[in-house]
């Protein structure tokens, strides 16, 4: 390629230095769009309220936001947020009032306001953070284990635990003189 460029009279392009993979990964993280505090305020003020326009936030929405951002902990509790929020004497407050609310909360609890705002801005979109899969209770395991069934219910399943279908549910009269489900039929004569 450099011979072609030299023949055309144009200078050859400078070789590009190799960039390590760690630097590329860091650059990729920097290229992600940063969500601002006001954008997060708008998103959380709409969270759980389909009629909201994103300009006012309630105490419960604020608490959800703070819990997701891990601002609410042992130092700052929902009681503290409730006390400071109620100072505004309104059910919903605007972004400017919310900034005053955070400033008052940070001063009272001796926490850096910038740290709180940084956590709130970088907590991600509103939603359920982690949902654990349902776990069967011990009672459910005990009740659904066919090997522990007794009486006539035991006859409804084969050795592997699979149901026998209609044959396991229907009482068929056999006329032998034994009750249904009796397993030692015709063994009395062998024992005596």
Swiss-Prot record:
Keywords per UniProt: Cell projection, Cytoplasm, Cytoskeleton, Synapse
Tissue expression profile of the protein: Highly expressed in adult head (at protein level).
A GO CC term assigned to this protein in UniProt: neuronal cell body
One Pfam family of this chain: p25-alpha
Region (Disordered): 1-20, 151-192
Compositionally biased intervals (Basic and acidic residues): 152-161, 183-192
GO molecular function, one term: tubulin binding
GO biological process: microtubule bundle formation; microtubule cytoskeleton organization; microtubule polymerization; positive regulation of axon regeneration; positive regulation of protein polymerization; regulation of synaptic assembly at neuromuscular junction
Localization per Swiss-Prot or TrEMBL: Cytoplasm, Cytoskeleton; Cell projection, Axon; Presynapse
SUPFAM superfamilies in alphabetical order: EF-hand (SSF47473)
InterPro entries assigned to the protein according to its UniProt record, in alphabetical order: EF-hand-dom_pair, TPP/p25
Phenotype reported upon loss of the gene: Embryonic nervous system defects characterized by cell misplacement and errors in axonal extension and targeting. Neurons display defective axonal extension. Defects are probably caused by impaired microtubule organization and integrity. During larval neuromuscular junction (NMJ) synaptic development, larvae show reduced synaptic growth and transmission. Severed axons of class IV dendritic arborization (da) neurons display decreased axon regeneration, due at least in part, to impaired axon microtubule integrity. Futsch expression in adult heads is reduced.
Keyword Magnesium annotated: no
Gene3D superfamilies: EF-hand
Subunit architecture: Found in a complex with tubulin and Futsch.
Biological function: Regulator of microtubules required for axonal extension during embryonic development and axon regeneration following injury. Promotes microtubule bundling and polymerization. Together with futsch, required for neuromuscular junction (NMJ) bouton growth by regulating synaptic microtubules. Function with futsch in maintaining microtubule stability and dynamics, is essential for promoting axon regeneration in response to peripheral (PNS) and central nervous system (CNS) injury.
Family: Belongs to the TPPP family.
Name under which the protein is recorded: Tubulin polymerization-promoting protein homolog
């Amino acid at each position: 390629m450099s011979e072609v460029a030299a023949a055309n009279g144009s200078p050859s392009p400078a070789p590009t230095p190799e960039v390590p993979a760690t630097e590329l990964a860091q650059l990729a993280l920097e290229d992600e769009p940063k969500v601002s505090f006001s954008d997060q305020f708008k998103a959380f003020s709409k969270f759980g309220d389909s009629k909201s326009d994103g300009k006012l936030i309630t105490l419960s929405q604020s608490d959800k936001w703070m819990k997701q951002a891990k601002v609410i902990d042992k130092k700052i509790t929902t009681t503290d947020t409730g006390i400071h929020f109620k100072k505004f004497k309104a059910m919903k407050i605007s972004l400017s009032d919310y900034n005053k609310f955070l400033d008052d909360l940070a001063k009272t609890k001796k926490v850096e306001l910038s740290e709180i705002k940084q956590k709130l801005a970088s907590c991600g979109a509103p939603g359920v953070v982690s949902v654990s899969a349902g776990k069967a209770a011990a009672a459910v395991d005990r009740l659904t284990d066919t090997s522990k069934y007794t009486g006539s219910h035991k006859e409804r399943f084969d050795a592997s635990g699979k149901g026998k279908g209609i044959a396991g549910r229907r009482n068929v009269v056999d006329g032998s003189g034994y009750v249904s489900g009796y397993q030692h039929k015709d063994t009395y004569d062998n024992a005596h």
